[in-house]
Amino acid sequence: MRWSLCLVATFFLGSVHAGDWGTVVLQPEVEKLEEVEVPLLHREVPEHELSGGGLTMEPEAGPYQWLSDDGRIRLRVGVGEDKFEEAVLTIWNWDNIPIYQKRIRGGTEGQFPVEIEGFGSYLVTLDGMSEGEVQRRMIRNITVTPDMNAARETWKLDEFFLGICTFPGRYHWTPGGEATLPKGLTEEEARNLEADLMARLGFQVVRTDESLEMGRRESDENEFLFNFDRMDAAVEAYTSRGFEIGLQLMNAADWAVAEKHNHVEEHRWRYPHEEKAQRAYIKALLERYGESARFVQIFNEPDQVEFWSGTPDEFVTQFEFSKEQIREDFPEVPIANGGYAFVDDEKTAFFIERLHPHVDYSAYHAHGTLEGMIENFEKMKAQHNAVGVSPAKWVNTETGFDAWRLDQERRQAQAVAQKVLYCWAHDHAGIMLFCGRMTRGPGRDGRDLGLVDYQFCSRFAYGAVAGLVSVLQGASFESVLVEEEGVFAYEFVVGEERVVSAFSLSDEGALSFESDASQVMVCDPMGNVVRQVAGGDVDLSLDGYPQYLVFRNAGSVALSE
């Protein structure tokens, strides 16, 4: 565990010409700028997506190198005078607080060196201005995180796994077949960049493009020919980096739809498929990827018609023969249902009752806030109780937060870390965050749940996951200290240390702890040590980000009365 002590820095507004740019030092604890001459992050500003055309901001180390190992980042920044009179470069910390700002005159281009002390993700906006008004905003992140690849070796997978959903094939292409941003990047290049960034966070399990190519019928005798080229590439990108697979089994190709539904012309993949073809497809997938599977998940969100348009009974039939096929070759691998979406409570209850005998993990999905996830989890428990069953383990196989507006990236980071901690504390086998990189609605103009953006910038959520993993690698969950009135605190054990993570849904509140520890280290959401306390008693002011208290040589930790 690397600890970084924090200092306080203050930055001032200035106007610069080419060659006048000194190094800017960013530290975890800073003072807010008194005046900000650009719109705040909740204001909608037309986005300038790509460098050029009047605004340029690129890392000198090379395209997409927004994350630094040593904290040093040099940006090439330029403002075209034919497009803008000037631009304002602003740096915002992960609390959406502006901490640095410079004016840059039109016709200026130069190197902008930054040193980041400690860990963290910072937002950089470059606002092109004319006649005193912002016309376009370029948005990027610069980030330093610890390399947590080694966490896959120390993480206690049998207690709780931390996973990520990534779709380098699906999200590299638009529905019309054109590559999404960034321009000129091949699917292979994009896939490897994303895989490197996800591996660096220490994730152990991935759900990726296993069902990207559905195969085709080879002859009238129902022989099947499957093309795994793109799936092999997607899976190998992660297994070669030490990941296990959350192997999701979707339907085979459209030609294999059951005869009863042959009249359907659109979205045939949503309907029941011929048993022979579906079994052949499942067998082929398992032969190829089964040895790497952490668990196998049969289908996705069957309780909503946009994924399953057959009857509930037809789904149960297909689920049962799918399980039989899995068990022929992999009798021990855990099986999960496709995560429930709670779109139709009656369907969800039906599936829980009928599928319970066939699953090892009872799976559900929950995007949005922690409160929304808790609501879905309570529904899961209530519906299981209503039919008198209890799963061996819960699992959340898809959960994210839509950063629908630029200021919401802070909420995204908070919610992602909160949900990991909550699931860990509530008897889940694991959690699958959604998602690595999502390029629908490139940039911040549309719906986006990615930990990294379309330019491979690591968002605040990326830094928050890195902070969580850096502090809790090798941990075992110990106890819930408090879950009431929007305040949460969880206790973990890591070797000789006890670690408490605490947060508040209201962005306010405080907790006091007492222990027999020799020392307490207070860590911020990004994993920086911001305070050290002699002895075992400590007070903590709360906000929406989980913070971490590391109690050295502690036998016990409790809330103070």
Mark where each language-model region is:
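Mature N-terminal, pre-catalytic/accessory segment of carbohydrate-active enzymes
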Residues: 18-197, 201, 208, 561
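Glycan-recognition and catalytic regions of carbohydrate-active enzymes
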Residues: 425, 439-440, 447-497
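Substrate-binding cleft and catalytic face of glycoside hydrolase catalytic domains
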Residues: 201-357
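Short, acidic/polar
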Residues: 176-198, 278-287, 344-354, 411-420
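Carbohydrate-binding surface patches
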Residues: 64, 89-90, 482-518, 524-526, ...
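Bacterial N-terminal signal peptides
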Residues: 4-15
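C-terminal beta-strand-rich structural cap/linker in extracellular carbohydrate-active enzymes
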Residues: 533-561
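Catalytic-core region of carbohydrate-active enzymes that cleave or remodel glycosidic bonds
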Residues: 357, 361, 366-440, 457, ...
